[in-house]
Amino acid sequence: KHYVRGQYEGYLQVPGVAAKSTTETYCAMRLQIDNWRWHGVPFFIRAGKSLPERVTEVRVVFHRPPPLPLTASRNEHPRSNEMVIRIDPSPGASLQLVAKAAKSHNYRNIHLDMDFADEGGEGPTPYEELLSAAMAGDKDNFADQSAVEETWRIVQPLLDDPPPVIPYAEGTWGPAEADALTRGYGGWHLPWLD
């Protein structure tokens, strides 16, 4: 099972929503790309309404390093380094490294963070960017027909035979069942927020 659908408790009381609606307000999935370059690399996606934060980010979690022979404890196993690209709110990037502290055998987390607005000023909003590109005839930010068809090929089986909608509490990160998707991969990560 690689797909979880959820609906926040209280959604059915929203004006205009059918009393027995099975429309999801949350989804989480684990995807694989079927080629040699990405073989064995999982891609996790989750999105939803009434979550604790409104944030869009891409997080690359690198392979966890093996236990190092010269550490204070033979059982010490550093966590994975991560690169986070925050798209919204306030675009930025963060490199989160595990490094050995000077004159010590202990590891600590080091964050190299950059808020793009601090460096280059506030840019246009994503909608302003898309509208400007559309008016200029720039197709780079828009999906072509082959990408749209491939997306439908991937999601159509989920639409044809969807799993049940699982209720989740407002202000949480979705149904607990979604945690099973990331089991063995370090779990879901909280978003990088300032």
Where is each model-derived feature located?
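Secretory/organelle targeting and membrane-embedding segments
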Residues: 1-194
